[in-house]
Amino acid sequence: LTATDIERGLKLLAWSREDLLKTVEGLDAKKLDQTYPNERWSIAGILKHIGGAECWYLDRLELALPREQIPGEPFARLKVSRARLNEVLPTLEGSKQVAGVDGELWSPRKVLRRALWHERDHIEHIRKLL
């Protein structure tokens, strides 16, 4: 990743998270925990999944926080996982690291790309449920 890639990535991550939080703003606990037919998760479950996925992506490069530091509450998990991603990305400038994990290759660029795509995908998922 170049410095420009990281700068742009951090901006896109911030905008995406802003969109996510605006999408769920004002939803009460009942709505967050509501289940939907043919859906794996409630909205709270989707939020928890997004945060968990960011931790998982970082784990591919051995950069994740220890599991015991990852909150279970969805909004806290989102905050902690994104803070870690924002902390780690600038340290990856110029990194040529490629890690093979479970038969899949991971690089800093792939982690950034997946985190961005995954959150956008689930923002649309939540919007469809609402």
Describe the predicted segments one by one:
Residues 1-25:
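Active-site-adjacent scaffolding segments
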